[in-house]
A protein has these predicted regions:
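Bacterial N-terminal signal peptides that target proteins for export
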Residues: 2-14
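N-terminal signal peptide c-region/cleavage motif recognized by signal peptidases
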Residues: 22-23
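Local sequence-structure signature of Cys/Sec-based thiol-disulfide redox active-site neighborhoods
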Residues: 27-52
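Loop/turn elements at helix/coil->beta-strand transitions in domains of secreted/extracellular proteins
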Residues: 28, 55, 107-109
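Short beta->alpha connector loops
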Residues: 37-38, 62, 116-117
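N-terminal, post-signal-peptide region of Sec/Tat-exported proteins
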Residues: 46-94
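Thiol/selenol-based redox catalytic cores and closely related redox-interacting motifs
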Residues: 75-168, 172-180
Length: 180
């Protein structure tokens, strides 16, 4: 075996090992979820997380206090708050985005999908609306100060456009908002 081939082979084995370690670290991450005992969509989100390899513990005590302690503002609020590996996760954030967060390890409070958009994990149904997964960089940031971490827009995929084809009235009615 030539040295060049051996080096390429060694790098490949090393990369596969690192990938396996990252997957294993994510798969062994325990998610602590704070929610209302009567919230059905929260239970569906917990199922989504478990289906994606996470260990999940639920605390049916509500999420208002833990949301505040975690540094998530009311403007970014949803029906449940989760804690995983030092990050706060607010609302119906897809498991893939949480895995990406745990892999990239940015300096941040965590992620949020504010309100309860139709089509998010736990909010599945016949209706699917566009939504953003927001990166919360600093405690108590408002919605306008966050960064879009990922965008889910079923309209853009169907039409080939980057803007949703929903009317303004449809967009405004597409989210189940929390009561203050």
């Amino acid at each position: 075996m030539k040295i060049k081939d051996f080096s390429r082979y060694t790098r490949s084995i090393f990369a596969i090992g690192l990938l396996g370690m990252t997957s294993q670290a994510i798969a062994t991450a325990t998610v602590e979820v704070y929610k209302s005992p009567t919230c059905g969509c929260c239970n569906k989100w917990v199922d989504h997380m478990r289906e994606n390899g996470f260990t999940v513990n639920t605390h049916d005590i509500g999420n208002k206090d833990i949301r505040k302690k975690s540094g998530i503002s009311e403007t970014l609020g949803s029906c449940h708050t989760a804690l995983v590996n030092g990050y706060a996760i607010e609302g119906h954030v897809p498991a893939a985005d949480i895995m990406r967060l745990l892999k990239e390890k940015p300096k941040a409070v965590g992620l949020s999908v504010p309100d309860m958009p139709h089509g998010t994990p736990g909010m599945e149904g016949s209706r699917v609306d566009p939504y953003n997964v927001l990166l919360i960089k600093e405690p108590d940031q408002s919605r306008k100060d966050t960064t879009i971490y990922n965008r889910y827009d079923p309209y853009a995929k169907q039409s080939g456009k980057t803007e949703p084809v929903a009317t303004e009235a449809e967009k405004n009615s597409s989210i189940m908002r929390l009561k203050p």
